[in-house]
Every structure is written in C-alpha cells, then in structure tokens.
C-alpha cells in the first residue's frame, strides 16, 4: 500500500513493473546507492517479469523528480542514485565504483561563492574522489 501511494505521489501509474522497482528501492531498512544498470540486474533476477532498462531509467528519473531519490554525479560523469534523500556528502572510490555516505556536518565549507544574478543555491553536495595510498 505504501509503495502504491509513493508511485501515485510521483504521478506514476502503479504497474506491476513499477511496483517491483519501487519495492527494490524502498522496501528495506538501510538506504543504498545504485546505478540504473545495477537496479536493472536486481529487478530482472529469475522469477520476475522482464523489465527493460528504458523502463528502469524512466522510473528512476520520475522518482528523482518527485524527490524520492537523489542523483549523484561522480568525476567521470557517471550517474549514481541514492535512496538517502537527507543532506549529506559522499566519498567515491573509482576503483571499486562505490559511494560512501559522509554526514553533512563532517564537511565544513568556509565560504561559498554567491550564485549568478537571478539564481539561488538549491543544494550543495560534495563528492570526494578517492585513490589508493
């Protein structure tokens, strides 16, 4: 019922495919990071109806627009998504392609430049790229 309400609040019809995608994303205790490709593999395991990668991308984009997930762009411009929608930052390890959450309070910025005229800052997220020592 909660999943169906989440879909409807995103202006998405609760089809079997969308319900399955939403369950993979939101029916868990822990938040997590994913790509459209890793989500595609997870929902297309044996025993489930096949869901196209296009449907995955469209549904993920709709959830992002609705504020149910966040998009994180890494330095290689790869899109990752996060079910944790609270303000926080990330470590990114390009070797493992893993993101790790950093509490928002852990990163202290001394000065943020003023935005261009007619614009305001909507959000600020820091992605710290890692490498081996």
Across the structure, where does each feature detected by a protein language model lie?
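DNA-recognition alpha helix
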Residues: 35-48
């Amino acid at each position: 019922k909660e999943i169906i309400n989440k879909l409807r609040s995103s202006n998405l019809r609760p089809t079997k495919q969308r319900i399955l995608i939403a369950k993979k994303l939101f029916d868990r205790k822990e938040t997590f990071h994913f790509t459209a490709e890793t989500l595609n593999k997870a929902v297309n395991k044996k025993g489930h109806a096949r869901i196209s990668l296009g449907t995955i991308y469209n549904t993920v984009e709709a959830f992002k627009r609705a504020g149910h997930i966040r998009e994180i762009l890494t330095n290689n411009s790869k899109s990752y998504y996060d079910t944790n929608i609270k303000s926080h930052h990330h470590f990114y390890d390009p070797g493992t392609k893993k993101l790790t959450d950093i509490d928002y309070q852990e990163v202290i910025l001394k000065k943020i430049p003023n935005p261009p005229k007619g614009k305001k800052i909507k959000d600020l997220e820091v992605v710290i790229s890692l490498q081996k020592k």
